[in-house]
């Protein structure tokens, strides 16, 4: 899933994070108990996976309440969402994903607002998480995740 969360309203942003987590829980519940499949009918079952990768411009920093909400433990049998960067680089400073070149818009300077979050059951497949801080093609820097298939 790719996303671009609210920038101006923290309340709206937290509602978006809440809904992302609810969609993940719904997909996992359906995966565990898929129900009756009626192929080639309007009732054909489209199973959603319990594994999830969500990336994009989340418009929150790693110390924000929205970040804490995104990575908070999920009750029940739903796999938690983890930050891919922290999984690969647990002791490293986070690479900036915005404010590198556009200092007018980002008065705060270089910092992170873009992430790859994925389910904990994909963590062992992460090979690389990197940020290209050399390009000025956008006000955000490209972030890349490589997984073992």
Task: Label every PLM stretch briefly.
Residues 1-149:
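Active-site regions of metal-assisted phosphoester/phosphodiester hydrolases
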């Amino acid at each position: 899933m790719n996303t671009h969360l609210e920038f101006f309203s923290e309340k709206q942003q937290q509602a978006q994070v809440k809904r992302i987590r609810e969609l993940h829980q719904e997909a996992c519940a359906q995966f565990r108990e898929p129900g009756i499949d009626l192929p080639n009918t309007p009732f054909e079952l489209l199973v959603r996976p319990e594994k999830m990768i969500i990336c994009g411009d989340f418009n929150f920093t790693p110390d924000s309440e929205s970040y804490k909400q995104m990575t908070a433990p999920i009750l029940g049998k739903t796999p938690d969402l983890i930050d891919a960067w922290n999984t690969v680089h647990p002791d490293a400073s986070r690479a900036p994903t915005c404010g590198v070149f556009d200092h007018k818009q980002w008065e705060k300077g270089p910092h992170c607002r873009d992430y790859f979050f994925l389910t904990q059951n994909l963590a062992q497949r992460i090979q690389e998480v990197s940020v290209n801080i050399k390009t000025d093609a956008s006000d955000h820097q490209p972030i890349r995740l490589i997984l073992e298939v």
